[in-house]
Amino acid sequence: MATPLASALRCFAVAALLATSCSTTPTLKRLECSGSIRRSVVFDSQSGQLYSYFPDLSVYRPTPELRFSVQTTSSLRDGSLVIETRVGEFSGEGDAVTWAAVEPPVGHTTTINLSSLKETVVALTGRPGVQFPDRHGLCRWAPLQTQTIESS
């Protein structure tokens, strides 16, 4: 007959096993931004957790309590669709978490004239392989310095 303590420990071990098997490996992205105080930002694209690179160890480590995100808003202004993308960070404790854009602003504003949109779509029809540059305003994706990630 199992004691209550043994049963509790067994349940805890099963719960810990399930929790670790459900955790995913971070998918790090490196964003280099010009015109910013930050030279580059490395973050997990799944959770938004910031990472720092340690060249002596050639490893990325999570930066405690910092969250990075890209926020996109859209609006209609004077017959145009305006899409604004800004880089920001979450801060705060508990339920009082706020998002603020980094300063100086990093991101891009795209304006699409809705009256000429039809003409633009027609002009691009029949041209396979039209590709847009892999950049986000003043930012661009950059390769990581290493693939080694140290968990927290």
Pin down the residues of each PLM region.
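Bacterial N-terminal signal peptides that target proteins for export
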Residues: M1-F12
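Residue-level signal for mature regions of secreted extracellular proteins and peptides
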Residues: A15, P26, F132-P133
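Short, solvent-exposed loop/hinge segments that bridge or flank secondary-structure elements
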Residues: L28, E32-Q71, L81, D95-I112
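Beta-turn initiation residues at beta-strand->coil junctions
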Residues: G35, V121-T125
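Edge beta-strand at a domain terminus
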Residues: T125-S152
